[in-house]
Amino acid sequence: MHVRPDWDLTRADLAALFKGYGDKGLEVHVTELDIELCERTNGTRTICDPDDATLLQAQADLYRDILAACYIDNPGVCTAFLTWGVYDGLTWLDNDGGRFYPLLFDENYEKKPAYTALYDLLKSTAEKCVSRED
């Protein structure tokens, strides 16, 4: 799943899509997920600032929304969630000379807001599961 924050993807739309597959008895596997930080212009690669807080937050929000649509909104339907790499220093997206910074860690292996968004979502979900009394 290769997406960009400038695409009009919402958690609700993704949740409905995943539910539709589940309603047909299918499992959903989100695989090869990467979310480009930089936008493309007319199909060409562009350069952007990998430290731009607005871009980083949009990327983090989309990572979080995809995971939430998968595991929180469709428990039992979504059975896999995998990224296409770990850090921005080694990504297939940079093969054409552009830079896209699509992963959870930057080029220095520092956590990006996307990592924190996924971690916080999973942690809050785990805490709810552990604290349930039923």
Predicted features along the sequence, with ranges:
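Surface-exposed cleft-lining segments at the edges of enzyme active sites
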Residues: 1-8
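Aromatic-rich peripheral "rim/lid" segments of glycoside hydrolase catalytic domains that contact
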Residues: 9-29, 33-134
